[in-house]
Amino acid sequence: MDMKITFPGGKQVNAEYNGFVHKTDQPLAAGGGNTAPSPFDLFLAALGTCVGFYVLSFCQQRGIDMAGIELRQAMDRDPQTHLIGRIDIEIVLPASFPEKYRAAVVQAAQLCMVKKHLENPPKFNLFTTIR
């Protein structure tokens, strides 16, 4: 699994992976052009969309209509470290959602691989090479 990181200009940094180019930029206040999400915004979106995928798959496998289902993700920053200390993901279900599946849809959402990697982080190795 290799990803190529490129620098197209300004504060933009792109990731080329699996046939896609994931573009990032910084907000205007940080000197960027605000032409794409920031890397941290993509990180948070990856978590939410991953959990959303598992909720979607759960419902599709059971023929449950997705109308009225949405996720809300809220992040709380630690005032001392300025890092996110807690992430709450609320699965909003319509009144028509089958009661017997309420706990099970949460269990399905727990399977998200992005969430699992945050709970069990990999080791990082940053280094340089000269070409």
List each language-model region with its residue ranges.
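Extended beta-strand/beta-hairpin segments
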Residues: 1-45, 55-131
